[in-house]
């Protein structure tokens, strides 16, 4: 019965995710990301890592799961806010959509066509915060140690 649910539910979930992928990023996501970037001071580096697994749980997890999420914030309050948002709203089935939405939030004028899929990405760009500038580095790809995929965002203040 459990396998039947997985096979019946997975296509419906995937279709719903495809329909919403690449819509305009949520204002709340943009807000927590901009607050995270704005909190960095000159010479300071902040980061978070959002781990996702679709179709199975992470490698060392005991229980079975259709999907799983984890977020590492290192105790940084601004990163904790991003992680709280991503744990509630971040996509697992199309994890690259969360990455593209985040880049679109922080890099003005950047958009992605609905046909774009990210399998591996590493990009860096400037962001001008209210009081100072920052360099943002985004990486996305396979996570060999835990399994699944990982989206990392690092901000280095000028």
Where are these regions (language model features)?
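Bacterial N-terminal signal peptides
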Residues: 7-17
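N-terminal leader/targeting segments
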Residues: 20-79, 94
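Long, charged/polar, surface-exposed segments that mediate recognition or autoinhibition
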Residues: 66-124
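A mature extracytoplasmic/lumenal domain signature
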Residues: 87-89, 142, 155-157
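Active-site beta-strand termini and strand-to-loop segments that position acidic
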Residues: 125-131
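Short, low-complexity, Pro/Ser/Thr/Gly-rich segments in the mature regions of secreted, periplasmic
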Residues: 146-158
């Amino acid at each position: 019965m459990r396998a039947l649910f997985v096979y019946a539910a997975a296509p419906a979930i995937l279709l719903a995710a495809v329909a919403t992928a690449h819509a305009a990023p949520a204002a709340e996501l943009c807000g927590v990301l901009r607050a995270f970037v704005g909190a960095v001071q000159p010479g300071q580096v902040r980061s978070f890592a959002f781990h996702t697994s679709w179709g199975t749980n992470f490698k060392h997890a005991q229980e079975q799961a259709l999907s799983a999420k984890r977020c590492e914030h290192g105790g940084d309050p601004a990163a904790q806010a991003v992680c709280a948002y991503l744990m509630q709203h971040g996509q697992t089935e199309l994890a690259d959509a969360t990455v593209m939405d985040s880049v679109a939030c922080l890099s003005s004028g950047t958009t992605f066509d609905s046909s774009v899929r990210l399998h591996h990405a590493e990009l860096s760009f400037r962001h001008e915060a209210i009081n100072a500038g920052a360099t943002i580095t985004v990486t996305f790809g396979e996570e060999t140690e835990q399994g699944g995929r990982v989206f990392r965002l690092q901000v280095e203040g000028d």
